[in-house]
Design a protein with these regions (language model features):
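Short glycine-enriched loops at secondary-structure junctions
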Residues: 19-23, 67-77, 117-127, 167-171, ...
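Active-site mouth loops of central-metabolism enzymes
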Residues: 13-24, 88-102, 181-192, 250-258
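Catalytic domains of carbohydrate-active enzymes, especially glycoside hydrolases
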Residues: 29-43, 105-118
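A substrate-binding/cap region within the structured catalytic cores of diverse enzymes
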Residues: 95-116, 123-139, 144, 151, ...
Length: 480
């Protein structure tokens, strides 16, 4: 039964505020929770502070908070001390539904233990453009059938552990070359990109709508602000009845073109249930309340959104118990079982592109797009006696991450050239990529292998594969 709510309390339930542990503003989040926001999206933190912080917010809230985070690569993607799992593209290289479901289960177990039951994953975008600056290894791959199978399996694993998965970014963010954190991408037609959302929706308790214009559906508005996309295509066209959320409303694709308060109202008008990460949560509530009182926002629409939100909270157990068990953090988060799951996925993902292996001795040259040292990879090779300054084999370790707000992905050609100079005496070059596989297009090598992220598990797997301890059974899920 829906609790009694005032009009302001209803619209507040639609707002999901943000909190960043690296830039904490406790006064702001406390005010937002007291004002009745329906959820909070967390960034950063550690296993030592997340659960207690969430419990404090839950005790402050009149209604249970639906707490979310971007756990695309496991809870460790955001929370230090939690398990970092290999990327979706790594799972795509395995082709294994079993491993996709395992990733979903491990992610959800740790998320629930931390008090964060809304898992903002899986990414269901198709990775079809090498110059896409924001999807890349976040995707399972280029093939719609593969993405559907693995996305469904991941979501199934999340649901089995009592958490809520979120497929994103509807209607498909893969076939663009613009980062929506900075600008508004434009897509002619969703085409095959709709397939994973349509075919996986039975397993998805929520779907996130992306900030991009789809000219074939609505050439005038971003999908997040378009009733033709949200109500027309997603609800009526595909028949989706679950929770629908916007992508973060503070992103440049929205804020560069429209006032923040107006964007929140338009997103609600379009049919979104949850308005994620507005720049000003209190201002968002005020704007929604004003729109409701003026008749601009239909009360029946708001009621339907609130019912979906409350149903989601019930399904993940918040109605019965909103308080996370601190003991579960110690027992579950970052446990040996989960670390072994990460290793299992990583080892199954290693992909041989060309050439002969194993490599017994080599000089290693690190080439990165910044801030990544691949310490585990080096240490694992050193432990096996595989590092040698005198070797005539040179290993170029290529690390390239997808980062929001950068607008590009890849390694500076000048950095690549310098690394080749340092390996000038090598008779044989072996390229090993950690993350973005397209970097191999820019590197001439005699042999090459891929892992699809720089997690410790993937670094260990790459080292073991390089020296011949494990096979390379992964299959490249994109076209280079």
């Amino acid at each position: 039964m829906k609790p009694r709510m005032s009009p302001r309390e209803k619209v507040a339930q639609m707002v999901c505020a943000d909190f960043r542990f690296d830039l904490p503003d406790y006064e702001r989040i406390t005010a937002a929770v007291k004002a009745g926001v329906g959820g909070v999206c967390l960034f950063g933190g550690s296993i030592f502070d997340i659960a207690s912080f969430v419990n404090g917010l839950q005790n402050l809230a009149k209604f249970p908070l639906l707490v979310a985070s971007d756990f695309e690569n496991g809870a460790g993607q955001q929370v230090s001390g939690a398990t970092v799992l290999p990327s979706n593209m790594a799972v795509g290289a395995t082709g294994s539904e079993e491993l996709a479901e395992l990733k979903g289960r491990v992610t959800a177990r740790e998320a629930k233990a931390l008090g964060v039951p809304w898992v903002l994953a899986p990414v269901l975008d198709l990775q079809v453009r090498a110059d896409n600056p924001i999807v890349n290894t976040r995707s399972f791959g280029a093939d719609a059938g593969l993405v559907t199978r693995l996305g469904r399996a991941f979501a199934r694993g999340v649901r089995a552990e009592g958490a809520i998965a979120c497929g994103k970014h509807f209607p498909g963010h893969g076939d663009v070359s613009t980062d929506s954190h900075l600008e508004l991408p434009v897509l002619d037609d969703p085409g095959p990109a709709l397939g994973p959302f349509r075919d996986a929706m039975e397993e998805l308790d929520s779907i996130m709508v992306g900030h991009l214009v789809v000219k074939g559906v609505d050439a005038e508005r971003p999908a997040t602000l378009s009733s033709r996309v949200v109500d027309g295509l997603l609800r009526d066209g595909l028949g989706y009845g679950g929770l629908v959320a916007t992508d973060a409303l503070m992103m440049g694709a929205i804020t560069k073109t429209i006032d923040a308060a107006e964007a929140v109202v338009r997103a609600a008008e379009a049919g979104n249930d949850i308005l994620l990460y507005p720049a000003d949560p209190l201002g968002a509530i005020d704007a929604l309340e004003k729109a409701l009182h003026s008749g601009r926002l239909n009360e029946g629409r708001v009621d339907r959104s609130v019912m979906r939100i409350l149903d989601a909270k019930k399904r993940c157990g918040l109605t019965e118990n909103r308080i996370a068990d601190p003991g579960a953090v110690e027992r579950v988060v970052g446990c040996d079982e989960h670390l072994k799951a990460a290793d299992r996925i990583a080892e199954a993902s290693v992909t041989k592109l060309r050439g002969e292996f194993p490599v017994r001795k080599a000089r290693v040259e690190l080439v990165t797009d910044g801030g990544i040292e691949l310490t585990v990879f080096r240490d694992e090779l050193d432990r096996r006696g595989a590092l040698s300054r005198d070797s005539d084999v040179g290993v170029i370790a290529l690390s390239s991450r997808v980062r929001a707000f950068q607008g590009k992905v890849g390694i500076d050609p000048k950095v690549l050239a310098k690394s080749r100079e340092r390996l000038a005496g090598a008779k044989r070059i072996v390229a090993v990529s950690f993350g973005n596989p397209y970097v191999h297009r820019d590197v001439a090598s005699d042999a090459a292998l891929c892992v699809y992220d720089d997690s410790e598990a993937s670094q260990r797997a790459a080292a073991r594969a390089l020296v011949g301890e494990i096979p390379m059974n992964g299959r490249l899920p994109v076209t280079l």
